[in-house]
């Protein structure tokens, strides 16, 4: 890495501009909110409206919400005829409210506009960034709190979850709200143990806990509970817990969550708890679900990818964090982070987003060390900052390979944005020792925004083959049918097809697809090559007249395999 003073004037000017933006942000809380809001939207909006529904979790959540809107049944959760009792109702209600609002505002075909279902996740991600700033103010200066929030906003994991119509961005929002309130209660009691605590922070704590429970069950209570236990053991005192108003607070939380839980028990006869707690949560702890098993230590390794670019400073910050572990601020943040992290590492099922609610604690710890100029200068740690450049370079290579393999093109449209991301990250690494870690991470954060543009705004929308369901829905709409009905052979039964083609979408074999076409006009059968022979045989046997609408060649990203489907329709009403 260069330490010379004659590095590019562009980099110096850019560095001053980024630092000036942070200076402006830290001039007042209002300015900080404006800058954080602007950067978070810059990081999250690319591709938000243009990427089709992604299989499988996003499409399942969105389809279950769509069925609520279709049936008016807002207690029960279903995907087609199958009950979906893995998660509580919170995210479905939020998505339904977003779609209803879209309909009221005149959004055409609002119920099949996936971006409307993503709005709660976008709101949750933006809110989580702002709450990271608010939580950070309990521990560090305004500048460090803003830097921590920026690291959250630019992280890879939030960039993914903030664009997905799932629970995790909203869970992050409620978790940071709860932990920020708990931090203020704890620090207040440690600094002034005899001073009476007001009702505001306990109200935030327990209301956020209720929201988290309605989103993803008791997970948020684990974050709160393990933090409280760890702090009480470390302090050798449990007295401070009274300031959280546990009895009245827990009662308030129950008042908020029990109505729906009672309603779903009355509806399901207890099968919700059997599936949600027994089949979903406990099975994830004791066994690897859906091929997502991994050994302990997986989250530690994934962290350096999912929290990039902030994760690059984690190793240099670690020695200072360890030295400060007995300070009350660092103690709280470590209590927030370590116990829950160990639980996740011990669980058999592992997915990158599970530990996301713990990342704000890491961001605040790193930001505090950066401002305190306490980062370690061990050579291998300094050399590790090359990963600021390696990640965008790897993304650029992956984008080109993706275009070549799937779209059979070089993807030239993505090159300028990938180049900007690489240049910014190159300067972040190359001038790390010249300009210091704060300016370096700011450059890397700008690079992350251009990585997002490259991947989400340019690459994914430019390769339609990655989204076969969208291709199918477009071909079916092009026929002019007002109320089309679709059946697909079993080789392609993705939730996105149900979301885009209708709740009545059926899955069958080749012969069943031929029978389906006999049902009437505007019926379409999607037949894979292996099922086409049985389809033709059955069609000939029953005298079915049919036409080929189109052959679709795409790539099923949920299983990582190519997909080829012929779209047939009956030649005339039967």
Tell me what each language-model feature is:
Residues 2-380, 556-564:
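Membrane-integral, polyisoprenol-dependent glycosyltransferases
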Residues 2-25, 199, 203, 207, ...:
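Membrane-embedded architecture of ER/inner-membrane glycosylation machinery
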């Amino acid at each position: 890495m260069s330490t010379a003073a004659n590095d590019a004037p562009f980099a110096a000017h850019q560095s001053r501009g980024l630092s000036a933006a942070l200076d402006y942000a830290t001039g007042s809380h209002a300015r900080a909110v404006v800058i954080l809001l602007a950067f978070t939207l810059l990081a999250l909006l690319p591709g938000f409206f243009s990427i089709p529904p992604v299989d499988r979790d996003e499409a399942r959540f969105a389809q279950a919400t769509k069925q609520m809107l279709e049936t008016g049944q807002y207690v029960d959760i279903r995907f087609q005829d199958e009950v979906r009792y893995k998660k509580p109702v919170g995210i479905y209600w939020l998505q339904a409210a977003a779609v209803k609002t879209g309909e009221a505002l005149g959004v055409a075909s609002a119920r099949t506009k996936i971006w409307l279902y993503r709005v709660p996740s976008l709101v949750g991600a933006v809110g989580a960034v702002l709450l990271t700033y608010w939580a950070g103010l309990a521990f560090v200066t305004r500048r460090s709190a803003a830097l921590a929030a920026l690291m959250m906003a630019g992280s890879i994991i939030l960039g993914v979850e903030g664009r997905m119509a799932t629970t995790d961005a909203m869970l992050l929002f409620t978790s940071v709200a709860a932990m920020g309130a708990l931090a203020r209660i704890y620090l207040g009691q440690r600094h002034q143990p005899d001073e009476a605590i007001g009702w505001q922070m306990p109200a935030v704590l327990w209301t956020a806990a209720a929201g988290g429970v309605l989103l993803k069950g008791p997970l948020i209570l684990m974050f709160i509970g393990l933090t409280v236990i760890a702090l009480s053991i470390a302090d050798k005192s449990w007295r401070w817990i009274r300031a959280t108003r546990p009895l009245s607070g827990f009662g308030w939380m129950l008042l908020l969550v029990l109505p729906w839980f009672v309603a779903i028990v009355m509806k399901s006869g207890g099968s919700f708890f059997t599936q949600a707690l027994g089949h979903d949560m406990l099975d994830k702890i004791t066994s690897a679900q859906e091929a997502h098993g991994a050994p302990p230590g997986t989250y530690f390794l994934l962290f350096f990818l999912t929290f990039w670019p902030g994760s690059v400073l984690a190793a240099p910050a670690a020695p200072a964090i360890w030295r400060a572990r007995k300070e009350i601020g660092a103690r709280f943040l470590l209590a927030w982070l370590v116990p829950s992290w160990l639980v996740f590492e011990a669980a058999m099922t592992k997915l990158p987003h599970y530990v996301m609610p713990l990342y704000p604690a890491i961001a605040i710890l790193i930001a505090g060390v950066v401002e305190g100029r306490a980062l370690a200068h061990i050579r291998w740690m300094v050399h590790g900052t090359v990963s600021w450049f390696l990640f965008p370079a790897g993304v650029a290579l992956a984008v080109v390979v993706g275009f070549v393999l799937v779209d059979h093109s070089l993807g030239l449209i993505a090159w300028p944005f990938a180049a900007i991301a690489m240049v910014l990250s190159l300067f972040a690494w190359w001038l790390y020792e010249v300009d210091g870690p704060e300016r370096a991470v700011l450059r890397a954060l700008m690079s992350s925004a251009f990585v997002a543009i490259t991947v989400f705004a340019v690459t994914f929308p430019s390769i339609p083959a990655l989204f076969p369901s969208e291709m199918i829905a477009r071909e079916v709409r092009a026929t002019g049918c007002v109320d089309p009905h679709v059946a697909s052979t079993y080789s392609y039964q993705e939730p996105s097809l149900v979301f885009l083609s209708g709740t009545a979408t059926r899955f069958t074999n080749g012969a069943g697809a031929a029978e389906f076409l006999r049902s009437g006009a505007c019926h379409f059968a999607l037949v894979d090559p292996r099922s086409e022979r049985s389809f033709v045989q059955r069609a000939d046997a029953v005298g079915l007249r049919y036409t080929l609408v189109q052959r679709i060649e795409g790539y099923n990203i949920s299983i990582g395999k190519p997909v080829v489907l012929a779209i047939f329709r009956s030649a005339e009403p039967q």
